[in-house]
């Protein structure tokens, strides 16, 4: 496995870093890992390495580079405050420019998919609806304003039933507007996949990973080449 940092450029000329993890053998495809509000921190790099261990090239773009680089925050109140401030400064459209640029590079390894967590879970939704990339969204708490958008690519969603950030009426609206979308619920809180957070739930995380890799095995094999518009 090769783990390193690379520099990429978005369509508007913005340069940004990305953490890259490559498997020892020819990749099965590529997966873009989209951060939480805490930046491309140790956990997000670990996620990229887990994906690489399953045979995919993994790229984690540092989308916060647009609003001040080298952002790597802890899972505490101070980290949440700084992360939310960066999210407010950045918005979704600029982050999608960086993700699209990452996808254009990542497709050198084959079909491209996306996985995102929390804020990145909402970006994963937008990757499916706007970029046409197969996507896995973990507990995307900011997705509600975009529920009228129609996915252009396969989409899988994971939520914790004890997630205080995502109310039941969100789930009801999601089911009403997208009744055929595969959505899984777990007996866990927000951030249940992250073993550095208080809400980490090992059994739920393991089951979600199995479903996630089954999704990528199926849909990256079927995915068309990514076209950057």
Q: Which residues are covered by each model-predicted region?
A:
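N-terminal cap/leader regions of alpha/beta-hydrolase-fold enzymes
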Residues: 1-229
């Amino acid at each position: 496995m090769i783990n390193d940092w690379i520099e990429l450029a978005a369509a508007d000329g913005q340069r940004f870093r990305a953490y890259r993890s490559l498997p020892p053998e020819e990749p099965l495809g590529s997966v873009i890992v989209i951060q939480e509000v805490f930046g491309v921190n140790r956990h997000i790099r670990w996620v990229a390495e887990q994906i690489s261990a399953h045979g995919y090239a993994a790229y984690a773009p540092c989308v916060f580079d647009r609003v001040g680089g080298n952002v790597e925050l802890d899972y505490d109140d101070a980290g949440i405050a700084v992360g939310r401030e960066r999210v407010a400064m950045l918005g979704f459209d600029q982050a999608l420019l960086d993700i699209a640029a990452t996808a254009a590079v990542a497709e050198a390894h084959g079909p491209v998919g996306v996985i995102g967590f929390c804020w990145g879970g909402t970006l994963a939704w937008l990757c499916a609806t706007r970029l046409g990339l197969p996507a896995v969204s973990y507990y995307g708490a900011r997705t509600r304003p975009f529920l009228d958008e129609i996915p252009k690519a396969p989409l899988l969603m994971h939520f914790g039933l004890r997630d205080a950030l995502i109310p039941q009426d969100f789930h009801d609206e999601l089911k009403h507007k997208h009744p055929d979308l595969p959505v899984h619920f777990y007996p866990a809180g927000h951030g249940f996949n992250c073993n550095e957070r208080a809400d980490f739930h090992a059994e739920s995380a393991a089951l979600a990973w199995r479903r996630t890799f089954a999704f990528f095995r199926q849909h990256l094999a079927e995915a068309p080449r990514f076209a950057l518009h």
